[in-house]
Amino acid sequence: MLLLLLGWPGAVGAAGQSRHFTTSDGVRLHYIEAGTGPRTLVFVPGWSMPAWIFERQVASLSREFRVVALDPRSQGQSEIARAGHDHVRRAGDIAELVARLGPRPVVVVGWSLGVLDTLAYVRLHGDGQVAALVLIDNSVGEEPPPPPPAQPMKPGPKLPREVMMKNFVRGMFATRQPDAWLERLTQAALRTPEEVARQLLAYPVPRTWWREAVYSTSRPVLYMVRPKWTGQAENLRDKHPSAEVALLSNAVGHALFVDDPAGFEARLRDFLRRRVWP
């Protein structure tokens, strides 16, 4: 009954404990934490998304690891910040969270825009506190560039933001998700102000900056992507001595850890067991 009320697709309801910290520029950030022990996973979500989109992973993986999921500034339950919606400040937010979590290196798991935030963290703050990187379904600046949209925007009246966000959220999944859960996710995404959302899609660096970032680390890297990123994945695998790739099918959508949580977690556990914490 609880699962039905929450509208959650096959996982527990409120996984983990809510925690907060204040950044060096005075912004109160929220994160979810579950599990204990010396092995810590830090999940960083995508554009406008809340930390609880990883709720299934927090519940499952916290049986073995300490698991943290961040609400980036102006997302989820974090404070709507007046500034800092760029790669430099958001990288600093991750660095300050990692420092707060303790002295042992962590595995940072970035999804979508969280891939770029994670790469910015490594490039600007180094990988001294990083045990490994897991980069999910976004460009890492390798060749070839991202393909153009399959369906270019048609001229005409702009859709209301609420409609656009609803379509965006539903488009992240290849499998059917409960309507109540999708509506909850849409409302969470709409909490990010429109101007902030625009800024987050316009980080002022060339795409080669991200390539240099991923090659700046010698830590193990798992690049888990759908077919649209096959070219970048193959180049990264061939050129980066510490990288490996997991090429998924189009049976999963952009939020592949929601569409196939068991498969995602199995791949992640295998990587951690072989490359990070044998």
Where are each of the predicted segments found?
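Active-site loop/oxyanion-hole signature of alpha/beta-hydrolase fold enzymes
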Residues: 24-25, 32, 69-109, 113, ...
